[in-house]
UniProtKB/Swiss-Prot annotation:
GO molecular function: ATP binding; ATP hydrolysis activity; DNA replication origin binding; lipid binding
Nucleotide-binding listed as a keyword: yes
Protein source organism: Chlamydia caviae (strain ATCC VR-813 / DSM 19441 / 03DC25 / GPIC) (Chlamydophila caviae)
NCBIfam families: PRK12422.1
Residues covered by region (Domain III, AAA+ region): 103-321
Subunit and interaction comment: Oligomerizes as a right-handed, spiral filament on DNA at oriC.
Protein name: Chromosomal replication initiator protein DnaA 2
Region (Domain II): 68-102
GO cellular component entries: cytoplasm; plasma membrane
Family: Belongs to the DnaA family.
InterPro entries tied to this protein: AAA+_ATPase, Chromosome_initiator_DnaA, Chromosome_initiator_DnaA-like, Chromosome_initiator_DnaA_CS, DnaA_C, DnaA_dom, DnaA_N_sf, P-loop_NTPase
Domain notes from UniProt: Domain I is involved in oligomerization and binding regulators, domain II is flexibile and of varying length in different bacteria, domain III forms the AAA+ region, while domain IV binds dsDNA.
Amino acid sequence: MRAWEDFLLLQEKEIGTSTVDKWLRSLKVLCFDACNLYLEAKDSFQVTWFEEHIRHKVKTSLVNNNGKLIRVHITSLDKTAPFYKEKQIQQEKTAYFTMQYGNVNPEMTFGNFLVTPENDLPFRILQEFTKPAEDTAGFPFNPIYLFGPEGSGKTHLMQAAVNALREFGGKILYVASDLFTEHLVSAIRSGEMQRFRSFYRNVDALFIEDIEVFSGKGATQEEFFHTFNSLQTEGKLIVISSAYAPADLKAMEERLISRFEWGVAVPIHPLTKEGLRSFLMHQAEQLSVRIEDTALDFLIHALSSNVKTLIDALKLLSKRVAYKKLAQQLLYEDDIQTLLHDVLEVAESVRLTPSGIVRAVAKYYGVSPESILGRSQSREYVLPRQVSMYLCRQKLSLSYVRIGDVFSRDHSTVISSIRAISQKVEEGGDDISIATQELMKSLTSAYKSLEFFPEEEISC
């Protein structure tokens, strides 16, 4: 249809041909009448991108020959079947979407949270303010905003607070930020915004993780702003987590940042290496396992310093030591490799490495790992190469020199490449920023898959 093609040409001038080709021209036109255009996306992520970046534009720029605005209806292949009849399209327009709570692990409690000098303050704050209120004055610090790097214990503390509050009844909503966005997009598509707002605002407390996911997402930020105001006005508890302090959030509306700072913003830091070793040595003693210092260091490294995984490994080690009648024997690195060989093999298979990052980026962009590591200066390969370097820096904390060794580049090239991607990520909103965010999420999911122990073996 001519109106849609004219709109795409206009967008090429505004956001670039490559972005239009990837996100808009790949949309399939299912049906068109004088005032309605029905599109099909390849997946829900493409729908989300459309809602965040294009929806507001079609509302003002997509018109028919009579100058009337054309309404765009978009569905995705991974959630709906193809539509060939107008009746089926109408059914999709009015479909009732699913709202669900985020998953909360009942084993994550305040009682089994490892309290250290690095996390004592956020622990005490959340524990105090998740007790049942004795009056109706609400919470003296609202919202509670936790920020710190991956592995610092934010998720455990958040879920411990949710579990504590649910013991006293009430409606406690816990969601990740990407689930909030997914719910919003579904509500917009199906015309169920009133239901969406009721779901998020008729609660006694809202816990939302990884708020930085909202960066660059105007529609999501707008809706969360009103959700926040509604809950705040009614004195409902709001707890937010992020990798960044409020002032360090990029592509986030100032009015939201201001509200995040209304209550208390508390940093939370991961365990120091010495603190982790001391804690694990104490755990081993409690389990009647004697482990030599360098053997413990080996285990910490092998299991990527994941506290929960390390505790489970010690429990499993205790059972196997007892079974083999090795109690009170000092265990060395060779003993650990023998007794936990199956665990270590799985851990190695999911360990995040530079080559693993390159493979993930290659798969995302549809190129080969060899082309990313090669010498070609074609943009088709340069961009994935730069993203790979950026992720190696962010996820593995590799030095510029080490990254240069991996990609056979000098460190100045590495620095400029990483800076280029960092700038795009900070600005937010474009396809490079979105791709990097998706890759970070998928790599984090793979890392978290270290939790692989059979429950019947480690329960004590």
